[in-house]
C-alpha cells in the first residue's frame, strides 16, 4: 500500500485552516474529530470480541498476550501491559509490550527502528515466543515492517495473531489471523496518527486486556477483585471493593482483608459465606478463582 494513498495520511478538510483560528476553535476542531473515534471502534466490536475470545483461550492454556508496535503504537502496548499486574494481580510476564528500538524508544524516537524486520523477529525470539502465545501487532498505518515481520514469525510458530491498524486492507490486517481496523479517517494534523488513530488503538487495547481479565475471573460485578494494594489509594480501594461486594462495613472489610493477607477475592468469600480465610481460599481454588462460581454453585 502506497503511503500517499493511506487514509491515515490523507488531508482533513475540517482542519484545513486550523492555523488561522482562535485557540478555542482549535480545541473545538480537535474535539469534534475525536468524537468520531468511538463510533469507528463501535463498527469493529465483533472483531474485537473475536480477538478477546482467542486471547482468553490461549492465556487459559498457559500462553501470554504480546503487544508489538513501533512509536506511539508500541508505547500504547507497553502502557496497557504495564497496568495489568497492579490492576488485576497478574504476573508481570503475562501481558508483554514490545516496542521497536527497545526501552530507549519509550521516550525517544529511534531512527529507522520501525523499518527493521529483523528487530520485530528478534524481539519476539528474545522473549522466547511459543505457539501458546498471542501476538497483537499494532500499527496505525498497517505497513510497519517491524510489526509485519513479527506477525509473520509468530504465525510460522503457530501463534494466534491479531493486527490492529486504521487503514483497510493493510499488510498488518492481512498478515494477522484476526484484523481489527477502526477507520478514523484523516488526522487533524495530516499524518499525525498519535491523535485519532492512537486514541482508537488505546480504546481497542483497553477492551482486549479488560475483556481477558473479566473472562479470567479478575472482575466480580464491575469490581477489580485481584487488585494489589501497592499504595494508600489502592489500600482504601480494597476496603471499598469488599464493602461493595458484600454489604459489610469498613471495619469488617479491613478485618477480613487482614485475615487473608489482603486478597480481595478471599475476603469477599469469607464475608459472604461466613468462612475463615483458609476455607474461603480453598473454595476459590476449587473454582479457578471465580467468585461467581463459588457463590452460584455452593
Swiss-Prot record:
Pathway: Amino-sugar metabolism; 1,6-anhydro-N-acetylmuramate degradation; Amino-sugar metabolism; N-acetylmuramate degradation; Cell wall biogenesis; peptidoglycan recycling. Its EC number is 4.2.1.126. Keywords: Carbohydrate metabolism, Lyase. It comes from the Bacteria. Disulfide bonds: none annotated. It catalyses: N-acetyl-D-muramate 6-phosphate + H2O = N-acetyl-D-glucosamine 6-phosphate + (R)-lactate. Induction: Induced by MurNAc 6-phosphate that releases the repressor MurR from the DNA. Repressed by MurR in the absence of MurNAc 6-phosphate. Residues 55-218 form the SIS domain. Specifically catalyzes the cleavage of the D-lactyl ether substituent of MurNAc 6-phosphate, producing GlcNAc 6-phosphate and D-lactate. Together with AnmK, is also required for the utilization of anhydro-N-acetylmuramic acid (anhMurNAc) either imported from the medium or derived from its own cell wall murein, and thus plays a role in cell wall recycling. This is N-acetylmuramic acid 6-phosphate etherase. The lineage of its organism: Bacteria, Pseudomonadati, Pseudomonadota, Gammaproteobacteria, Enterobacterales. The gene is murQ.
